[in-house]
A protein has these predicted regions:
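ATP-binding/phosphotransfer module of carbohydrate and carboxylate kinases, centering on a glycine-rich
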Residues: 1-42, 83, 102-104, 157, ...
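Phosphate-binding/catalytic loop of phosphoryl-transfer enzymes
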Residues: 42-49, 53-169, 287-300
Length: 300
């Protein structure tokens, strides 16, 4: 599918009521359709990306760091507004779907897409199938524990991988702030390029913070590899600006758990911008459903 129209809004999500969130979603799509010149009635499928946990059916946003509200029926809102079937997916799952379609030779059967940005998340493919939880979208890699009782995470708990590897966590450590410093809201802008520049210029605290992020990521991967064996990794987002500093710590953390394999054989590839992958993932999700409907109609 080709992009025919776009619409965006800057919102302080933490201040929004459920009705505000609903109005923003519906309004954005209506505005995009108005700009396109096409009638809303031509919509066939809607795919929504979210940062957070959805129900396994892909209808409800159960939890997200961007809002205090829970159990938001995003699919129902869009379905009622546009009379179109709607799915809701975790953003990292969508990135994994996009990579699977964009580079099928590299990302075909078993791999993980790990976002390193305002948060840390994972989309996981095993044997050609996206992995989710029993009841939720699951695979919350960023909220696996790295250091019990450690640094404060945006989720409110302590010691999560995200509390060391997200942009706010690296900035906190690079500034020498206490580990219990409250993380900023996801909408707050963090100039990660500045942190990268400091580290590349030799700033000791910035380098140490980035290396600790690498250890957190590598330790989390160790746990996964112990369960299902090693797989390819795609690191996505602005955190990849410092991959050259982070990589050694990641591979060092992996060294003791790869079951005798060579850690340098584990393919790690970087993508600096997550937004195009999320958009592709949404398009793929919607188009795959339409393909199935067309195929089923042809069989009948």
């Amino acid at each position: 599918g080709a992009t025919i129209s776009e619409s965006s809004r800057q919102l302080t999500s933490a201040e929004l009521t459920p009705q505000d969130i609903r109005d923003a979603l519906v309004g954005c799509l209506k505005n995009a359709m108005d700009r396109s010149g096409y009638d809303d009635r031509l919509l066939s499928r809607i795919a929504v990306s979210v940062q957070g946990v959805t129900d396994v059916a892909g209808s409800v946003l159960l939890w997200s760091p961007i809002t205090e509200h829970r159990d938001l029926p995003l699919a129902g809102w869009m379905r009622r507004a546009f009379s179109v079937p709607t799915s809701v997916s975790n953003d990292c799952d969508l990135m994994a779907r996009a990579l699977n379609r964009r580079e099928p030779k590299r990302y075909s059967t078993s791999f993980a897409s790990i976002m390193l940005s305002y948060g840390v998340g994972m989309g996981l493919f095993l044997r050609g199938t996206i992995v989710n939880g029993l009841n939720t979208s699951g695979t919350e890699f960023g909220h696996m524990v790295f250091q019990p009782g450690g640094a404060l995470c945006r989720c409110g708990r302590r010691g999560c991988i995200e509390a060391y590897a997200a942009d706010y966590a690296i900035r906190r450590a690079a500034r020498g702030e206490p580990e219990d410093t409250m993380p900023p809201a996801p909408a707050d802008h963090i100039d990660f390029q500045q942190i990268a520049d400091l580290a590349h210029a030799g700033d000791a605290r910035a380098i140490q913070a980035i290396e600790e992020a690498g250890r957190a990521i590598g330790t989390g991967l160790c746990s996964l590899f112990a369960l299902v064996d090693a797989f390819r990794i795609a690191l996505i987002g602005r955190g990849t600006l410092v991959f050259d500093i982070m990589e050694g710590a990641i591979r060092e953390a992996l060294e003791s758990t790869v079951g005798g394999g060579n850690i340098n054989d584990i393919d790690i590839h970087c993508f600096a911008d997550e937004k195009p992958l999320v958009a592709e993932g949404c398009a793929i999700t919607a188009l795959l459903v339409l393909d199935e409907e067309i195929a089923d109609a042809a069989v009948v």
